[in-house]
Amino acid sequence: MDYSELVSIRNNSVEEISSWLWVTEDNGAFDGPKSDWGPLKQGILDHVKNFDVVVQAGGNCGMYPRLLSDMFKRVYTFEPDPLNFHCLSYNCQKDNIYKMNAALGETNKLVRMQRVSMANVGGHRVSDTGDTFIPTFTIDQLALDKCDYISLDCEGYEPNVIAGAMETIAKFLPVITLETVNEEINMLLSPLGYKRIDGHFGHADKLFAVK
C-alpha cells in the first residue's frame, strides 16, 4: 500500500538519531515517548543486569525499538497497525532488530484493532469494536534462549501479553516495564518474586523486577 501522503520525515533528534519517518498528523506518539525516554533508559540501566535480548510492544513507529537496539544485542518488536509498521520498518533497519507486523497476546488468534486517532497513533488498541483484524502471537512462542527485559505499552492489553509470556518470564525473570497494571498482572508476577520498583520511569511506565 502507498502511504506516501500520510507520512513524512521528522528531523527532531532523539539520542542523536534524526530523520524519523513518521505519521504526519501525529504528535502524541512522538513527543511523549521522546520525553519519557530519559527516565526509562535510566531505569533500564539501573535494573537490567544483562543486555542480550529485549521484547518490546507496541513498536509504534519505531522510536523505542531503534533506541533499544543500541543497548541490547537483539530486539524483538511487535506492531500490529500497518501504517505504524511501515514507519517502524523504515526507522528500524539495524540487523539486530526483529520486526513483526502483529500484536502480542495470551494465545495465537485473530483479534480486532481499533484506530483511535491519527493525532496519537500510539493509541490504537485491541477492541471488540475495531474494524481491522490482526494476528496475535505469544512471547512464549518465540522460544527465546535469553530474555533480559520486556517492555510493554499495549493500551490495556498488557495482562493478556503477560499471560502469554509466563513460561519465558519464569525461566529468565526479566525486568518488565508496563504502562497498564492491574490485579491480574500482580497475581501473575507476584508468585515469581516480582516487586514493583519505586521510581519515575516515564509518565506512565511501572517497572517490575525480582529483588
Name each model-derived stretch.
Residues 25, 100-102, 137, 199-200:
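Conserved beta-strand termini and adjacent loop/short-helix elements that scaffold enzyme active sites
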Residues 101, 151, 177-180:
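Short beta-strand segments
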Residues 59-63, 82, 106, 154-156, ...:
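Short, glycine/acidic-enriched loop or turn micro-motifs at the edges of active sites
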Residues 78, 82-120:
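Core alpha/beta nucleotide-donor-binding catalytic domains of modification enzymes
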Residues 72-73, 171-174:
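A short helix->loop->beta-strand "cap" motif at the edges of active sites that frequently abuts
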Residues 1-95, 128-129, 144, 187, ...:
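S-adenosyl-L-methionine
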